[in-house]
């Protein structure tokens, strides 16, 4: 029983190594910090999953749950804070889905 399992495992590893050897080399624009790009707001000259920052470099974007808040440096591939969640203070990086916080009256001593 265990010998069959080992043979299947080895066959899988060999198949994976052959498949990965035929993959084309990664696009230099897909490597964070290595590729130069022209920064243009709302445009993306980098490959999918990357974005061009103001430093004219392609930076990795984390999609979905791990997305960075939207802001000056992150127009593409960013997530807006959900408005149903805790209200967050308005700021440079949080223009949508935020609520202005009213100053609380301090109790007098």
UniProtKB/Swiss-Prot annotation:
Keywords: Disulfide bond, Knottin, Secreted, Signal. The presence of a 'disulfide through disulfide knot' structurally defines this protein as a knottin. Disulfide bonds join 30-47, 37-52, 46-58, 70-90, 78-98. Coiled coil: none annotated. Residues 1-21 form the signal peptide. This is Cysteine-rich venom protein 7. Its main location: secreted. Expressed by the venom gland. It is found in: Secreted. It comes from the Eukaryota. One of its GO terms (cellular component) is extracellular region. The keyword Chaperone does not apply.
């Amino acid at each position: 029983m265990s010998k069959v399992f080992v043979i299947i495992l080895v066959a899988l590893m060999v198949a994976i190594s052959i498949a990965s050897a035929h993959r084309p080399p990664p696009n230099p624009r897909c490597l964070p910090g290595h590729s130069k790009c022209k920064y243009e707001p709302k445009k993306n000259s980098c490959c999918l999953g990357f974005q061009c920052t103001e430093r004219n470099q392609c930076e990795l974007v984390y999609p979905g749950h791990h997305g960075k808040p939207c802001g000056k440096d992150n127009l593409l591939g960013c997530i807006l804070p959900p408005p149903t969640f805790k209200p967050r203070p308005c700021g440079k990086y949080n223009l949508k889905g935020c609520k202005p916080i009213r100053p609380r009256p301090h109790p007098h001593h």
